[in-house]
């Protein structure tokens, strides 16, 4: 009854109006699962391959009909007949069928769509919530959200190099309360921006993209919004985080961090040592608790030096640096580079490999932050993954745009369903920091 009888993929649109995949899996019992695949704007060079058609006459070359065909004509034939509950066997079968180290033959987008749909079909068959199916009876921790309320870098037209300015309600007592704090700060920030005559249109992830005078102007404006909303900045209230996305402005030939790429003539050009000094200055000055991709993805010496300098005080998250890949994470652990990993399901391409990366991180004392992509859909699977793994943190955008709010609303439902069992750890989610 739990045997897969049909697998079907179609091309749909993501939050940027670009094509992506939606996959459906059906079983003998009538149980059904659907998965939709996200897409990134700033991508690590070591990520699994997102297969696009390349036909410039259709969706500017971004069509996904090849990936759709791979699901309908190759993957479907291979996994029909499997028990839908055997997630690992199905994921391993797809990896073997692809046969490349980066899923470049079938496409990570094709494989991931199936992987998510299989898990959802299994949960439907067992008549349990997805987070419960994936995580078992010990599922209880609601994630502390990283809320990207100001967009810069590749996610907006704002003249700021850092890609994301985030708030984290670490002092809240429940996820529901944390979400309210974030929403109130978001609206307070909008009011402040209007009063300054700054743009209040939002970027890809729902954050504002105003033309601030620089990084510090952005941080100080957010701090004013926190105060205006009636909260305090710091460990008992709301803390700040950055996604520097440093690989986006790192000049490989000159080996410098060239801020002029986004901030224009006269902006800083920093060596690795100067980049670390700059980040330390910001940490000393502001209530910053997390920095993502503070160094270029291939600047291993820089990462190690940054971790030695700030690793006991601040969460240093590897996104492009680790690309949700256990090989890169294992090296980072061995060389003591970073102390946290960003988890993006489409960087690696299956739920099995995603869970392996989270488990490896936790065993090494690294934190794991489950994350969306800038090109999202209404699919809320990452909310369930965050709770299923007791990850403790989630990064899924600002307090606007349905593609972001869908994840927050799912977390509200989960917290409600868990009732008294639910835990929101807030500042304790940063369990490997010394302060």
Swiss-Prot record:
Keyword Nucleus: no
GO function term, MF aspect, one: magnesium ion binding
First-tier enzyme category under EC: lyase
The protein's Enzyme Commission number: 4.2.1.11
Residues annotated as binding (2R)-2-phosphoglycerate: 163, 344, 373-374, 395
Xref: Gene3D superfamilies: Enolase-like C-terminal domain, Enolase-like, N-terminal domain
Subcellular location field: Cytoplasm; Secreted; Cell surface
Keywords: Cytoplasm, Glycolysis, Lyase, Magnesium, Metal-binding, Secreted
List of residues binding Mg(2+): 243, 292, 319
A biological process term (GO) from this entry: glycolytic process
Domain of life of the native organism: Bacteria
Cofactor, free-text remark: Binds a second Mg(2+) ion via substrate during catalysis.
SUPFAM superfamilies: Enolase C-terminal domain-like, Enolase N-terminal domain-like
Family designation: Belongs to the enolase family.
Name this protein carries in UniProt: Enolase
Organism whose genome encodes this protein: Streptococcus uberis (strain ATCC BAA-854 / 0140J)
Lineage: Bacteria, Bacillati, Bacillota, Bacilli, Lactobacillales
Encoding gene per record: eno
């Amino acid at each position: 009854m739990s045997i897969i009888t049909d697998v079907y993929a179609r091309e749909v649109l993501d939050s940027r109006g670009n094509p992506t995949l939606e996959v459906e899996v059906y079983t003998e019992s009538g149980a059904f699962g659907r998965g939709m695949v996200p897409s990134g704007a700033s991508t690590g060079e070591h990520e699994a391959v997102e297969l696009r058609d390349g036909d410039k006459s259709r969706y500017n070359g971004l069509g996904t009909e090849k990936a759709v065909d791979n699901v309908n004509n190759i993957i479907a034939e291979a996994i029909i007949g499997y028990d839908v509950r055997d997630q690992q066997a199905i994921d391993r079968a797809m990896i073997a069928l692809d046969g490349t180290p980066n899923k470049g033959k079938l496409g990570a987008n094709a494989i991931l769509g199936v992987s998510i749909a299989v898990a959802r079909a299994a949960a439907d068959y067992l008549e349990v919530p997805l987070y419960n199916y994936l995580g078992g009876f010990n599922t209880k921790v609601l994630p502390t959200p990283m809320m990207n309320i100001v967009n810069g870098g590749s996610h907006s037209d704002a003249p700021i190099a850092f890609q994301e300015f985030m708030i984290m309600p670490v002092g809240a007592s429940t996820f529901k309360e944390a979400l309210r704090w974030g929403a109130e700060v978001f609206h307070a920030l909008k009011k402040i921006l209007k009063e300054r005559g700054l743009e209040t249109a939002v970027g890809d992830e729902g954050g504002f993209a105003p033309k601030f005078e620089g990084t510090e102007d952005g941080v100080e404006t957010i701090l004013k919004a926190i105060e205006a909303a009636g909260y305090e900045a710091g460990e008992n209230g709301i803390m700040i985080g950055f996604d520097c996305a440093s690989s986006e402005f790192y000049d490989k030939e000159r080996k410098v961090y060239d801020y002029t790429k986004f901030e224009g003539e006269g902006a800083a050009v920093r060596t690795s040592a100067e980049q670390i000094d700059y980040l330390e200055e910001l940490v000393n000055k502001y209530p910053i608790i997390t920095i993502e991709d503070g160094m270029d993805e291939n600047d291993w010496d820089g990462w190690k030096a940054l971790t030695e300098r700030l690793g006991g005080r601040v969460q240093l998250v590897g996104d492009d640096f680790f690309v949700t890949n256990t090989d890169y994470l294992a090296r980072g652990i061995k060389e003591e580079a970073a102390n946290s990993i960003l988890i993006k399901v489409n960087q690696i391409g299956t739920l099995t490999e995603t869970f392996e990366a989270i488990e490896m991180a936790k065993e090494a004392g690294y934190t794991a932050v489950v994350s969306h992509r800038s090109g999202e859909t209404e699919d809320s699977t990452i909310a369930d993954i965050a709770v299923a793994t007791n990850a403790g943190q989630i990064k899924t955008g600002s307090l606007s745009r349905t593609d972001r709010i869908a994840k927050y609303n799912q977390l509200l439902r989960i917290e409600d369903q868990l009732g008294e069992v639910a835990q929101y750890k807030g500042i304790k989610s940063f369990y490997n920091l010394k302060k």
